[in-house]
């Protein structure tokens, strides 16, 4: 959605969409979206709970990874603000119209307004959505950088916290995310420069991934060699195995994310060029917003310890009920065994008595 302030050169670029639909249909779709987001939030928060309860990775890695999952809440706040404008719960005082293109320079497809009055909350929601997207992009690169540092400082990284590493990486990634998000909203940069962080970070992350994989596989091969001359401490061996475990998990998550981004990218392009009806924008938009479903489930089921805890926690009432049923069945079996033993004893003594009479 592009907003143009009349009698000025000011433009506002928001990653929000509005559709020309009856209010009843908007209400029905919004109820579905809210229900899906509530369930998605439950899955996400449960996944974060499991990751924090069963910490299998270094504290610095968790410091960077958990916020990447939790930042979805910021995205959903922006989504809820958009829904409020669609349903006219927040009314700017004029019709917003239909806006289903990602970006355009066509004046007929932009929203012409006298000023930003009444749109402040929508602009804030749009900023939250842009900020979430770029926080994930730079956050992934920050995680890859932290794992590179862990591989370089293999001698004592496991035994020393070095909490300043994730703090510095977080500050840098957030400064970049906030700066680019503000620049996009004010259209200080166009679509090409807006895509540039993706173009730069993607190959950089792949190169870092290959470096970490090669380094740690070489170290593991050396550790497993009985004729090695180099001495590896227990913490160093654990660090190598942790890096490789993180890579395996990261590979699966990257495949899911690439698949997700590809579908969303094709969908947004199809909407922009009018290849599909505008109504399909709901499907593409919600497909993007509900990304924690595949990502969290992939993470939880990739590691056995997380998977077991996740299964126990996802339906606590059902699990408690099953535990009670299992306990009752066990007690009944024990009682039946005791009764059977008692009957057999009575029969034995009765037969013994009869044999003596």
From Swiss-Prot:
The chain crosses the membrane at residues 31-51, 61-81, 121-141, 165-185, 192-212, 253-273, 283-303. Keywords: Membrane, Transmembrane, Transmembrane helix. It is a multi-pass membrane protein. Coiled coil: none annotated. One of its GO terms (biological process) is sensory perception of chemical stimulus. The keyword Translocase does not apply. It is found in: Membrane. InterPro entries: 7TM_GPCR_serpentine_rcpt_Sre. GO terms for cellular component: membrane. Belongs to the nematode receptor-like protein sre family. This is Serpentine receptor class epsilon-30. It comes from Caenorhabditis elegans. The lineage of its organism: Eukaryota, Metazoa, Ecdysozoa, Nematoda, Chromadorea. The gene is sre-30.
């Amino acid at each position: 959605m592009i907003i143009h302030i009349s009698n000025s050169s000011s433009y506002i670029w928001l990653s929000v969409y509005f559709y020309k639909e009856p209010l009843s249909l908007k209400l029905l779709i919004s109820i579905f979206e809210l229900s899906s987001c509530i369930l998605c939030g439950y899955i996400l928060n449960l996944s974060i709970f499991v990751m924090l309860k069963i910490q299998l990775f270094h504290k610095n890695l968790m410091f960077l990874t958990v916020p990447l999952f939790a930042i979805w809440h910021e995205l959903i706040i922006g989504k809820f603000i958009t829904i409020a404008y669609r349903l006219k719960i927040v009314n700017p005082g004029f019709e917003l119209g239909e806006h289903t293109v990602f970006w355009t320079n066509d004046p007929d497809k932009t929203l012409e307004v006298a000023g930003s009055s009444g749109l402040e909350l929508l602009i804030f929601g749009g900023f939250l959505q842009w900020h979430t997207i770029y926080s994930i992009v730079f956050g992934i690169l920050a995680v890859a950088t932290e794992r590179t540092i862990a591989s370089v400082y293999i001698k004592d990284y496991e035994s020393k916290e070095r909490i300043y590493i994730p703090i510095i990486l977080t500050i840098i990634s957030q400064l970049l995310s906030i700066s680019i998000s503000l620049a996009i909203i004010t259209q200080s940069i166009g679509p090409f420069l807006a895509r540039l962080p993706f173009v730069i970070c993607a190959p950089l992350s792949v190169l870092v991934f290959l470096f970490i994989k090669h380094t740690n596989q070489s170290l593991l091969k050396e550790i497993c060699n009985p004729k090695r001359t180099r001495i590896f401490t227990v913490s160093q061996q654990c660090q190598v195995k942790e890096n490789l475990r993180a890579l395996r998990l990261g590979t699966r998550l990257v495949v899911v994310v690439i698949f997700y981004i590809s579908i969303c990218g094709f969908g947004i392009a199809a909407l922009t060029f009018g290849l599909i009806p505008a109504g399909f924008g709901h499907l593409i938009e919600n497909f993007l917003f509900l990304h924690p479903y595949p990502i969290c489930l992939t993470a939880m089921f990739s590691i056995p310890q997380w998977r077991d805890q996740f299964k126990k926690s996802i339906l606590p009432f059902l699990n408690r009920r099953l535990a009670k049923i299992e306990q009752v069945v066990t007690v009944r079996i024990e009682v039946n065994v005791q009764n059977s033993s008692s009957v057999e004893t009575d029969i034995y003594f009765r037969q013994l008595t009869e044999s003596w009479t």
